[in-house]
Amino acid sequence: MAQMNFGGVIENVMTREEFPLEKAREILKDETIAVIGYGVQGPGQSLNLRDNGFNIIVGQRPGKTYEKAVADGWVPGETLFGIEEACEKATIVMCLLSDAAVMSVWPTIKPYLTPGKALYFSHGFAITWNDRTGVVPPTDIDVIMVAPKGSGTSLRTMFLEGRGLNSSYAIYQDATGKAWEKTIALGIGIGSGYLFETTFIREATSDLTGERGSLMGAIQGLLLAQYEVLRENGHTPSEAFNETVEELTQSLMPLFAKNGMDWMYANCSTTAQRGALDWMGPFHDAIKPVVEKLYANVKCGNEAQISIDSNSKPDYREKLEEELKALRESEMWQTAVTVRKLRPENN
């Protein structure tokens, strides 16, 4: 395990140098790994494991997702099964269902979690708030997690490009004494770049905070606020969108992703430098109390309960589509459609 300096704090990380793919294969050579759920994370993780030479099967109920698995090369009766049969065959059950689906399918999965098996998650939600989800594993199995820091699509794309998506890992229960090595081996097998240690509760709280905050909720709120102010002051949709979204996503984000924010500040105009340095403080001071409120709401379980209640409603999909339709048809994101068409690579 390597020790790395993260902003002055030393953390332990695991890379492919310390734990090569060959070692992962050796550790898991006698295991049958079943990916349960072929939705968001399922395809990327299962296909990467398959391509890396592991004994992998998929468990999925009939429907569109099942047909997608067939299209991806999983063979019914050989490597593709119903959930019950896949869980029965598996020694490692990778539960990659959505949080809502885990709750409904858990009674189906649990009887097959016999002593010595391992139960794997890629999100700490179901275990962290198991007083709300009802997901309480048997005490005589390993319960482990590898959580890629990105979508299943990104995990697969980066794997095919010869790169890797960083992942966190955690061990909730070690009944066999081998949970750690299984966890790291699976993390390497799915195509992780490097692996850093966490706990189920830390992963769940940071993940929900990030999704509602800077990764999705807050970024939409910030972009829309700036776009609206520009439009209210006479700027055209094209100008407002370019100055708010397009320049950020197409020009600036790749720069600070590669080189850091200080590098980006150092390589922009003096007018931009001064303004950014002066205004980052007021934005920080305005936003931090909102993030603190968000984190508290996540940590106490309120956000988990909101998600559970919402996803459990029979008309959830219909209401979700209504909300997404409103977002999609808003002026800002309709402007985006035209702007994207005008990008040079699309002409």
Model-predicted regions and their roles:
Residues M1-L28, D51, N130-T133, P138, ...:
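N-terminal ligand-binding/catalytic initiation module
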Residues A2-F6, E11-E17, E232-N347:
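NAD(P)-dependent Rossmann-like dehydrogenase/reductase catalytic/cofactor-binding core
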Residues A2-G77:
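NAD(P)+-binding Rossmann beta1-loop-alpha1 motif at the extreme N-terminus of oxidoreductases
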Residues T32-A34, N55-I57, E78, T91-M94, ...:
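Structural motif
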Residues R61, V70-T128, V136-S151:
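Rossmann-like NAD(P)-binding element
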Residues Y66, A86, V102, P237-F241:
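Small-residue helix-packing motif on alpha-helices
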Residues Y120-R212:
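Rossmann-fold dinucleotide-binding core
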Residues G177-E232, S238-F256:
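Active-site-proximal catalytic alpha-helix in oxidoreductases
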